[in-house]
């Protein structure tokens, strides 16, 4: 969704940034994990397919995807590289385009060291707030 292409959401534990082509190699690496494939009901994709998926998510009017970054790592770096801070992703799927207040949020904390630390909870809360604010702004 182009709506979030220039958006950064800063929480206490996580930073949400738009999913761009620079994130694809790390994301693809995560999705080679059989555990993550099982937990997310995903099929393994080639790197080229992963790039195509990222492009389609960016263009779809009913999807909004952010990469979840570890805020502590991101803020500690003099020049933060997002790839080194990646923890997972969060998605908003609009389930009824006639009523954009209806949707589904999915969160994946792919980095094992980031699990159990509240990253998923904060990412979901930031996404709910962003979705509500974006809806209000578009009316």
Regions found by a protein language model. Give the residues of each.
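GNAT-family acyltransferases
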Residues: 1-114, 130, 134
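Extended, charged alpha-helical interaction scaffolds
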Residues: 135-139
């Amino acid at each position: 969704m182009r709506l979030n292409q220039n958006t950064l959401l800063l929480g206490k534990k996580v930073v949400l940034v738009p999913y761009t082509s620079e994130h694809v190699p790390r994301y693809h690496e995560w999705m080679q994990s059989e555990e993550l494939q099982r937990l997310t009901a995903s099929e393994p994709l080639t790197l080229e397919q992963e790039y195509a998926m990222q492009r389609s998510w960016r263009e779809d009017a009913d999807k909004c995807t952010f990469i979840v970054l570890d805020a502590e790592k991101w803020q500690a770096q003099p020049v933060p590289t997002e790839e080194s801070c990646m923890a997972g992703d969060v998605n908003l799927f609009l389930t009824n385009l006639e009523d954009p207040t209806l949707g589904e949020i999915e969160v994946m904390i792919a980095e094992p060291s980031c699990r159990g630390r509240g990253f998923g909870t904060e990412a979901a809360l930031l996404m709910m707030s962003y979705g509500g604010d974006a809806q209000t702004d578009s009316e």
